[in-house]
A protein has these predicted regions:
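N-terminal, membrane-interfacial amphipathic/helix-forming hydrophobic leader that caps
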Residues: 1-70, 204-223
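Functionally important transmembrane alpha-helices
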Residues: 169-223
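Aromatic-anchored segments of alpha-helical transmembrane domains
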Residues: 28-38, 93-102, 155-164, 198-208
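Helix-capping/transition residues at the boundaries of transmembrane alpha-helices
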Residues: 38, 141, 183-184
């Protein structure tokens, strides 16, 4: 019996370590794309995509190895309304703060022009939420369980990926907390992407680009 208990504890520790290693690997790939690749090859987005594709490959492999289905990850519709209800108040509060910030900084109601790239933003938001919550949040839960520790880790990771933009890092830290908490209660990536898209578009349209340095992160922040 003691031997079985020891083996169980060892397996648990190993599983936690692997989950954390997976998080570190994916985050490192994203940071390499933001900082290292773009610092040497500014004009080629295809080259910058290489570490991102490697991270995506690791994520998909990990999901397969752990037997996680797309529904498990949050690509589902049965709890979409419930997830939206969880996100309604924090998203509305975020929109109010953003609009007031735009007004206080003397930006017009539509500080930025509606660009065609905004049409693709929901897909980009869905991908980010898939990586942030469908992968990182789930791995954080394997290491620390549901609750404050794993939610804190998700928020910190999301903020880290938006450095060195200080204001954007703070905003994404708070957003990361909210989305991570909502995901743990109602895992629905479509609802998270909807909230993410609405907040991002509102920020781009109502807040002066100078306040967030045109939402630049990584090496692009400097020019």
């Amino acid at each position: 019996m003691p031997s079985q208990s020891a083996n169980s504890e060892t397996t648990g520790v190993t599983s936690d370590a692997v989950a954390l290693w997976e998080i570190v690997s994916v985050v490192t790939s994203a940071l390499i794309a933001e900082w290292v690749v773009l610092s040497f090859v500014r004009q080629s987005k295809l080259i910058a995509a290489i570490p991102i594709l490697m991270a995506l490959g690791l994520m998909l492999w990990s999901h397969r190895e752990r037997g996680e289905t797309w529904r498990d990850l949050g690509f589902r519709k049965d709890n979409f309304v419930s997830a939206c209800r969880l996100l309604l108040l924090p998203t509305a509060a975020a929109l109010l703060v953003i609009i007031v910030a735009g007004w206080l900084t003397n930006a017009s109601l539509l500080a930025g022009n509606f660009r065609s790239r905004f049409l693709w933003l929901p897909l980009w938001a869905l991908f980010q939420q898939f990586a942030l919550n469908g992968f990182i949040n789930r791995r954080a839960q394997l290491a620390f369980g549901k609750g404050a520790k794993s939610i804190l880790l998700v928020g910190i990771v999301f903020s880290l990926l938006h450095l060195p933009n200080p204001l954007l890092a703070v905003v994404t830290l708070l957003g990361g907390f909210i989305w991570a908490a909502a995901y743990q209660r109602q895992p629905n990536l479509f609802a998270l992407a909807l909230s993410h898209s609405v907040v991002s578009i509102t920020m781009a349209l109502t807040v002066s680009p100078n306040l967030f340095n045109s939402l630049r992160v990584g090496f692009k922040y400097f020019g």
